[in-house]
């Protein structure tokens, strides 16, 4: 149950004081561990994307088969603790569940997550659903670039390890642009509603 919540909250992977350049160096071991310890179910994802066009369903599959509970604790705890962004995200989960706002960064994302908790009546499944349906978009709408940057790097690792560039139909660009297109497919209606045709995925 708690792993499901961590998975939903991972899409939020909220702020840190580190910039993107430091993230690459300090979190490289964590990203590699996520593949080595099978926190990402790469065999299943590789089959699901093989021969498929980019779609919203592809985003849902990546979400479903990436276990951030494993990344945060059971599989890559040491690597997570050495990566300030990952450690910060774990600590913020506690703050979110207690209804506290510990950071002034990514206010739209944080406010959405806090609202999910406040209106959930402590129902973890309702929190999970709310975060996925209402809040994940704010990781990619340009209001929280550190969130989108981190999630994109997790995807880049699975993309390279799973050879997604050779498997996804009609796509030959780099992994980070692939994820950008997947995010855009998932949240197309919300980007259009907000007057944006393209999202931000790092």
Swiss-Prot record:
Membrane protein topology class: Single-pass type II membrane protein
Record topology, Extracellular segments: 24-202
GO terms under cellular component: membrane
InterPro entries assigned: DUF5332
Top-level taxon in the UniProt lineage: Eukaryota
Ranges facing Cytoplasmic side: 1-6
TM spans (from-to): 7-23
Pfam families xrefs: DUF5332 (PF17266)
Annotated keywords: Glycoprotein, Membrane, Signal-anchor, Transmembrane, Transmembrane helix
Glycosylation sites: 53
Subcellular localization, as worded in the UniProt entry: Membrane
Chief localization: membrane
Disulfide-linked positions: none
Name under which the protein is recorded: Uncharacterized protein C29G2.6
Organism: Caenorhabditis elegans
């Amino acid at each position: 149950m708690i792993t499901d919540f961590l998975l939903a909250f991972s899409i939020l992977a909220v702020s840190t004081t580190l910039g993107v350049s430091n993230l690459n160096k300090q979190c490289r071991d964590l990203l590699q561990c996520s593949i080595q310890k099978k926190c990402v179910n790469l065999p299943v994802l590789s089959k699901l994307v093989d021969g498929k066009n980019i779609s919203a369903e592809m985003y849902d599959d990546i979400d479903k088969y990436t276990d951030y509970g494993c990344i945060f604790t059971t599989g890559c705890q040491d690597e997570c603790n050495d990566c300030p962004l990952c450690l910060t995200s774990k600590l913020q989960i506690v703050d979110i569940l207690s209804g506290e706002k510990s950071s002034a960064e990514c206010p739209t994302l944080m406010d959405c997550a806090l609202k999910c908790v406040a209106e959930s009546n402590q129902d973890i499944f309702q929190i999970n659903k709310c975060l996925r349906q209402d809040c994940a978009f704010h990781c990619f709408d340009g209001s929280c670039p550190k969130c989108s940057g981190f999630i994109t790097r997790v995807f880049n690792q699975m993309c390279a390890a799973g050879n997604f560039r050779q498997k996804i139909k009609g796509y030959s660009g780099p992994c980070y642009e692939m994820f950008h297109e997947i995010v855009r497919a998932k949240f197309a209606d919300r980007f259009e509603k907000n007057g944006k045709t393209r999202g931000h995925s790092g």
